[in-house]
């Protein structure tokens, strides 16, 4: 079991590392490529577009051909794309490399969740996904620091050499440590009820959890996107103050994420999901009424706590109905989360909504819709029947 957890964590970490590690070198990259920082900021959207593109195909391929081949290819693509970025001499080539980085990270991301669905029951999976969320929160804090230390002695290309090395490590783990977990066959008693056709993506429970997780990701990405404006322009923080504040909020996320597995031993998953949405609602109300920086910071802290306590649980429930189509389900969740959050941020920008109102709107909207879905759509017998790990996996 340890090998599956190690490989899943490594596969997931390529995604945030690809986003955060290069940011510290952006001014120097822009200067060397004769591009403005504003032009290169589109690299974030290009990276997410690459992830979404990979997710369209990676899940189905993983269900048909296996988790291991997709993981190896994804890591290889990430490694080669990182080298392409390091060799870029102009902006378009750099953006092409960023897109391919997203493709590699997206394939690995999908496979990681499929592996956890294959190997863990609902209770253990919810705990592991909460821990995974906590570990993921470390990357946005550590990656810029590591990037800064690297650039003290080496050029910006070394950032992408480092990411390329990460791709190699993940590829080697996938090749030599990871075992195939795609279901080969089910027990005879399960054949009548467990088939790819029976595991439809269009069922009320899955759609409800897809909506909850998509709205939750929209909240956290809106917070990340709006935080520079809120903290440095509206609240008057310096860059140093901003970095410290974001590190503290990441610390809150880590503490709550690592505490959630213990909370699952005391409370039902539904209770934690309601607590999560209650924190979002409280954060939205707090930010709308805040007149001091202290109150605003308290509201921002509630956002991080709310996301950390509920997201892993909701993701675990969303994957529960799928024993044979875990890859497709994971892809669908990833695509919805990436595209849904990007759509909200884009629409808010087009409509001229301020950073604070953008954040308040998604907090209140997410909490109300999610609470209604949690109360109105509960796991039915069909979902419970599919909630089991595969009978046999390949060695």
From Swiss-Prot:
The name this protein goes by in its record: Multidrug resistance protein MdtL
Q: Which GO terms describe its molecular function?
A: transmembrane transporter activity
For the biological process aspect of GO, one term held by this record is: xenobiotic detoxification by transmembrane export across the plasma membrane
Q: Which organism is it from?
A: Salmonella typhimurium (strain LT2 / SGSC1412 / ATCC 700720)
Q: Which HAMAP family does this chain map to?
A: MFS_MdtL
Query: Which positions carry the signal peptide feature in this UniProt record?
Result: none
Lineage of the organism:
Bacteria, Pseudomonadati, Pseudomonadota, Gammaproteobacteria, Enterobacterales
InterPro entries per record: MFS, MFS_dom, MFS_trans_sf, Multidrug-R_MdtL
Q: Name one GO cellular component term.
A: plasma membrane
* UniProt similarity note: Belongs to the major facilitator superfamily. DHA1 family. MdtL (TC 2.A.1.2.22) subfamily.
List where in the cell it is found. Cell inner membrane
């Amino acid at each position: 079991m340890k090998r599956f957890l190690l490989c899943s964590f490594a596969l997931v970490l390529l995604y945030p590392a690809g986003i955060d590690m290069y940011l510290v070198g952006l001014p120097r990259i822009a200067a060397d490529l004769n591009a403005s920082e504003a032009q290169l900021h589109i690299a974030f959207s290009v990276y997410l577009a690459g992830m979404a593109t990979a997710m369209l195909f990676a899940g189905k391929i993983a269900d048909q051909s296996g988790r291991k081949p997709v993981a190896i290819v994804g890591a290889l693509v990430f490694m080669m794309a990182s080298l392409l970025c390091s060799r870029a001499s102009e902006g378009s080539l750099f953006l092409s490399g960023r897109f391919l980085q997203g493709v590699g990270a997206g394939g690995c991301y999908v496979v990681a969740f499929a592996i956890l669905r294959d190997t863990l029951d609902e209770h253990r999976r919810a705990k592991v996904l909460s821990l995974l969320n906590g570990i993921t929160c470390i990357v946005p804090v550590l990656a810029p620091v590591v990037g800064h230390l690297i650039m003290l002695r080496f050029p910006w290309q070394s950032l992408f050499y480092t990411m390329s090395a990460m791709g190699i490590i993940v590829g080697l783990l996938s090749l030599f440590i990871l075992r195939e977990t795609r279901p080969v066959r089910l027990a005879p008693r399960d054949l009548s009820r467990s088939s790819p056709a029976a595991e439809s993506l269009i069922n009320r429970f899955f759609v409800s959890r897809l909506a909850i997780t998509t709205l939750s990701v929209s909240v956290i990405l809106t917070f990340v996107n709006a935080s520079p404006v809120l903290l440095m322009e509206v609240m008057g923080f310096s860059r140093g103050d901003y970095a410290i504040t974001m590190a503290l909020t990441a610390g809150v996320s880590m503490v709550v994420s690592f505490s959630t597995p213990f909370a699952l031993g005391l409370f039902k998953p539904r209770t934690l999901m309601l607590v999560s949405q209650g924190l979002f609602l409280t954060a939205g109300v707090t930010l709308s009424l805040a007149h001091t920086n202290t109150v605003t910071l308290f509201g921002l802290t509630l956002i991080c706590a709310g996301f950390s306590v509920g997201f892993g649980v909701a993701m675990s429930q969303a994957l529960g109905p799928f024993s044979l189509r875990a890859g497709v389900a994971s892809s669908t969740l990833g695509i919805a989360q990436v595209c849904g959050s990007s759509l909200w941020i884009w629409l808010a920008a087009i409509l001229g909504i301020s950073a604070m109102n953008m954040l308040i709107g998604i907090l209140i909207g997410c909490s109300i819709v999610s609470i209604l879905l949690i109360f109105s759509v509960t796991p039915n017998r069909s979902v419970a029947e599919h909630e089991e790990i595969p009978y046999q996996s390949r060695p």
